[in-house]
Structure formats: C-alpha cells, structure tokens
C-alpha cells in the first residue's frame, strides 16, 4: 500500500481501515518490515513538529540593527543536547525500547548579507509505547513551551503484544530472541483495530537510510523459510481457529 513512510493522513492502510476495516480482519498481522530475520515487537510512536523563532532583518554589516533568528535557536539546540544526556531506554513488556529526540531540518536565512529575520526548526520525537500519543505531545509542549509549535505528524506507538498465542507460536518458530522495533510501523494500526501484529522481514534495519543501505540476498531466503516453517505447523491453524475471527 502507498505512503507508509510519510504523514499519517496519507497512509494507504489507514484509508483501507477507515473505508473497509472488514478487509483487515485477521488473527495475526505480520508486517514485512526489515528486521534481519528477528521478530521485533511493537513500535515507537512518532511526533514531528516545528518551532518558530522570530528575529529582525538587518544588513550583516550593521548587524546590531537587527536580531539574528539563527543565533536565537541556541536555547532549543541546548534543550536537545541536554536531552541526549538522560537514559533514553524504556522497558515495555520485557523489550528495551530506546527513545530519540532530534532536530532533523532547519529553515532560515534570506541572503548571504542579511541577518536572518526568522528561523524554523523541525524536530522528531520517537517515543516508547509506555505512553500514548497525547502524553508524548503534552511532554513536548511542556519541554518547548517558550516557542510557537506546529505539529506536522503524530502517530501512536504499539505495545509488543508478543504474549498473544499466535505471536508466541511465531516467535518460537523463528527461534531467535525478539527485540523492540526502533521506528514506527503499521503494527500500530493493527493494534488500534485489536489485531495482534509483529514485525518480521529481510534486511538489517540498522542500515536504513544510510549510504550503504542494502539487503543480503540470503536474508530473503531465510525469511521465506521461517514463514513457511511456521505456516506448516498444525497448531497454527488450531490457534487461528481459537482466535474467533471470521
């Protein structure tokens, strides 16, 4: 489905859920997210927002006549830097999630000889599933209370839920120690629908968006083999039947 990586309003799975949720009825959803063949439970929530900083334009040769909005970003950057000093790990249902709060984009400047009259910084907060989207938003609004905030995207996290019978069966079939999902995935949407979901697929997520991003060809075969092995087990059909879904 389209638009999985951008703002929630464009997400194709969300549109299906809104228009024909019956098409998504299932006992277990397996999201083929890159996990390098390891089951990853739940997912982080994500919040993207901008903060606006005002200044006053002036010629850079007479900078004292203006107010540099770029320089006035410093307190925000200091908050972000200070935040990195605390322990970002949060334990949820036995899985150790790591939160992140980072500046990802800056917009400022008019010309090379003009003091910037305004600046906008975009920040991405990746939060653990021990909190709701509303709680995450409140935390950010309190942390950056001194600046006008515009929320661009806010998506709920999902708790691991690996104690569900089919999920437990799949973890056992894969045979590796499950871990947390660093990032937001559509397990959150299935969670909202009351459907157990987990992440499992080829490709090492630690290479995502890096210059050397790649996927081992063998990882495709290993993932397929794990899925086939699990689906061939008799108890999978039995557990699915006990799920009570049509």
Question: What does each of the following model-derived ranges do?
Answer:
Residues 34, 41, 48-246:
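Metal-dependent amide/peptide-bond hydrolase catalytic core
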């Amino acid at each position: 489905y389209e638009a999985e990586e951008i703002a929630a309003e464009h997400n194709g799975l969300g549109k299906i859920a809104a228009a024909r949720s019956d098409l998504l009825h299932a006992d277990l959803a397996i999201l083929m997210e890159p996990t390098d063949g390891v089951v990853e439970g739940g997912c982080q929530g994500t919040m993207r927002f901008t903060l606006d900083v005002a200044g006053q334009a002036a010629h850079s040769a007479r900078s004292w006549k203006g107010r540099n909005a770029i320089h006035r970003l410093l307190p925000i950057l200091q908050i972000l830097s200070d935040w990195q000093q605390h322990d970002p790990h949060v334990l949820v249902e036995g899985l150790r999630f790591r939160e992140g709060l980072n500046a990802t984009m800056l917009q400022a400047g008019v010309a090379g000889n003009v003091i910037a009259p305004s600046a906008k910084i975009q920040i991405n907060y990746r939060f653990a599933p021990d909190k709701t989207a509303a709680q995450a938003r409140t935390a950010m609004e309190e942390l950056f209370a001194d600046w006008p905030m515009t929320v661009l995207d806010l998506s709920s996290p999902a708790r691991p839920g690996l104690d569900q019978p089919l999920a437990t069966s799949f973890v056992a079939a894969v045979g590796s120690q499950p871990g947390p999902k660093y990032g937001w995935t559509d397990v959150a949407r299935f969670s909202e629908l009351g459907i157990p979901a987990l992440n499992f697929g080829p490709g090492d997520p630690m290479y995502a968006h890096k210059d050397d991003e790649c996927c081992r060809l063998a990882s495709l075969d290993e993932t397929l083999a794990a899925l086939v092995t699990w689906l061939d087990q008799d108890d999978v059909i039995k557990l699915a039947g006990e799920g009570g879904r049509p």
